[in-house]
Design a protein with these regions (language model features):
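Transmembrane alpha-helices of multi-pass small-molecule transport proteins
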Residues: 25-79, 103-111, 161-169, 184-202, ...
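Helix-helix packing/entry segments at the starts of transmembrane helices
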Residues: 36, 96-103, 169-192, 224-260
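Juxtamembrane helix-entry segments on the extracytoplasmic side of multipass membrane proteins
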Residues: 1-4, 26-35, 61-66, 140-162, ...
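C-terminal-most transmembrane helix of multi-pass membrane proteins
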Residues: 38, 140, 212, 248-301
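Glycine-/small-residue-enriched transmembrane alpha-helix faces in small-molecule transporters
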Residues: 1-43, 48, 82-83, 143-172, ...
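Specific transmembrane alpha-helical segments of multi-pass solute transporters/efflux pumps
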Residues: 13, 18, 49-96, 100, ...
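Specific alpha-helical transmembrane segments that line the substrate/conduction pathway
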Residues: 32-43, 84-119, 124, 159, ...
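Hydrophobic transmembrane alpha-helices of multi-pass small-molecule transport proteins
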Residues: 45, 49, 120-142, 188-189, ...
C-alpha cells in the first residue's frame, strides 16, 4: 500500500502546479515556466544522484542500451512540456489537459506491453477506463460540440506518449539494478541541462521578481524534485502501468485545490467525475492475489 501512497503523494505535488501559477500571477510564458521547473527540479535531482554511490554493474544490458534508456527518458521529459502547452493552446486548457492526461496511461500500457511482451491485466484496464471517464467529466469537455485542431490533438497525445517514455524507461533502468533516485537524477538532470537554453530564450526577467522566484522554487522543489523522488520510489515497487493510472489522481487533487484555495465552483458532472476517478484509483490500488509490488534489489534498498 505504501508504494501506491507514494505515487498518490507525487500526484498531489503535481496537482499544485496550476494553483501555484494562479496565486503567483507572474508575467511569464508557459514555456518559460515549464523550462524553469525542469532546470530547478532536474538540477536538484541530478545533484542528489551524483551524491550517491555508484550503482555498480547493472544486472543486465549493455552500457549503450542503458545510455539509450536514459537519453530516451530525458527526451520524454523535455518533450512533455512544449507538447502539452501546444495542445492546450490549440484546443483549450480543458481538452488539451484531458487528452494529455488520458492518453498517458494508455500509451504507457502500450509501450510497457511491447517491452514486456505481456498485456496489462483486465483489472488495470477496467480501473483505467473508469478513471479516464472521470477525467473527461471533471475537465468539462462534455458540453456541446467543439471544433478541434488535429495538430493540437496530436500534440496532447504526444505529451501523453512523452510521459509513457520516461516512465517506462525509468522502470527499465530500475529493473537493471539502478536506484530509483539515481534513475530520476540521470533522466531529469540531463533534461535540466538541455532546458537551460530554452529558459534563456523564453525569458528570465520574471525570475527576478519575488513571486516569480517563489513560483520557480515551488515548481522545481515540490512539483519536480520531491514529486519525482516519490514517483521513483513507487515506480521501483509497482508496475509502470499501475503507476500511470495512479497519477490520474492529479486532476482530482487539482480540482479540490481549485475549490478550497481558489474558490472555484464544482458542478454536478464534475462531482461525478471526481467520484469515478476515486473509484478507479481504489480499484487499481487494492491488493490482488498476484502482488503488483516488484521485489527487486532497488526496492529493498
Amino acid at each position: 500500500m505504501l508504494p501506491a501512497l507514494a505515487i498518490l503523494a507525487a500526484a498531489l505535488c503535481f496537482s499544485t502546479t496550476g494553483t501555484a501559477q494562479a496565486l503567483a500571477g507572474v508575467d511569464a510564458s508557459p514555456l518559460a515556466v515549464g523550462a524553469a521547473r525542469i532546470v530547478v527540479g532536474g538540477g536538484i535531482l541530478g545533484l542528489l544522484a551524483l551524491a550517491q554511490r555508484s550503482p555498480g554493474r547493472a544486472r543486465s544490458g549493455s552500457r549503450a542500451s542503458t545510455a539509450a534508456l536514459i537519453a530516451v527518458g530525458a527526451l520524454g521529459v523535455l518533450a512533455y512540456q512544449p507538447l502539452f502547452f501546444l495542445g492546450t493552446r490549440e484546443n483549450g486548457v480543458a481538452i488539451g489537459t484531458v487528452v494529455a492526461l488520458g492518453s498517458a496511461p494508455i500509451a504507457t500500457g502500450i509501450v510497457d506491453a511491447v517491452r514486456l511482451r505481456r498485456a496489462p491485466t483486465p483489472r488495470w484496464m477496467l480501473a483505467t477506463a473508469v478513471a479516464l471517464i472521470g477525467v473527461v467529466l471533471v475537465s468539462g469537455v462534455t458540453g456541446g460540440a467543439t471544433a478541434l485542431a488535429p495538430g493540437g490533438l496530436l500534440a496532447s497525445a504526444g505529451a501523453g506518449m512523452s510521459y509513457a517514455l520516461y516512465t517506462v524507461c525509468g522502470k527499465a533502468l530500475i529493473e537493471r539494478g539502478w536506484n530509483s533516485t539515481r534513475v530520476m537524477g540521470a533522466v531529469f538532470g540531463i533534461a535540466a541541462v538541455a532546458s537551460l537554453p530554452v529558459l534563456v530564450l523564453a525569458g528570465t526577467s520574471w525570475l527576478l521578481t519575488p513571486n516569480g522566484l517563489a513560483l520557480a522554487l515551488w515548481l522545481g522543489v515540490v512539483t519536480t524534485a520531491i514529486a519525482y523522488l516519490l514517483f521513483g520510489w513507487g515506480l521501483a515497487r509497482l508496475s509502470a502501468v499501475t503507476v500511470s493510472t495512479l497519477t490520474l489522481a492529479e486532476p482530482l487533487a487539482a480540482t479540490l485545490l481549485g475549490l478550497f484555495v481558489l474558490r472555484e465552483h464544482l458542478t454536478l458532472v464534475s462531482g461525478i467525475g471526481l467520484a469515478l476517478i476515486a473509484v478507479g484509483l481504489a480499484v487499481v490500488s487494492a491488493p490482488s492475489r498476484r502482488r503488483e509490488e516488484v521485489p527487486d534489489a532497488t526496492a529493498r534498498a
